[in-house]
A protein has these predicted regions:
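Short acidic low-complexity segments
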Residues: 28-29, 41-55
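Extreme N-terminal starter segment of soluble prokaryotic enzymes
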Residues: 1-5
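NAD(P)-binding Rossmann-fold cofactor-contacting core
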Residues: 20-42
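Conserved Rossmann-like nucleotide-cofactor binding loop
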Residues: 12, 38, 65
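N-terminal Rossmann NAD(P)H-binding glycine-rich loop of SDR-like oxidoreductase domains
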Residues: 6-19
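Glycine/small-residue-rich loop that forms an oxyanion/phosphate-binding "nest" at active or ligand-binding sites
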Residues: 52, 56-85
């Protein structure tokens, strides 16, 4: 099973991806990152990358352009592959 971090989880695409991933058996959301207040029953949500643990197989990014640099710094620093949306 792949563990994913969902960047931009509070946005429209983030919420859609959350609902689609919840239906799958081969992956799960390990954490979400979004500066907007958001609560999920399924995974912890962090307001910034400094708080997010790096225990993931990949990052799905549907955040705003302003969130791209911190996310890429986190991903490259921890060797985590990224899918940009």
């Amino acid at each position: 099973m792949k563990h994913l971090i969902l960047s931009g989880c509070a946005g429209r695409m983030g919420r859609m991806l959350e609902s689609l991933i919840e239906q799958r058996d081969d992956c799960r959301i390990a954490a979400g990152v979004d500066p907007a207040p958001y609560h999920s029953e399924e995974f912890p949500v962090y307001s910034n990358w400094e708080r997010c643990p790096p225990n993931a197989d990949g990052i799905l990014d549907f955040s705003s352009p302003a969130g791209l640099s911190p996310m890429l710094e986190f991903a490259t620093g921890h060797g985590i592959p990224v899918v940009l949306g």
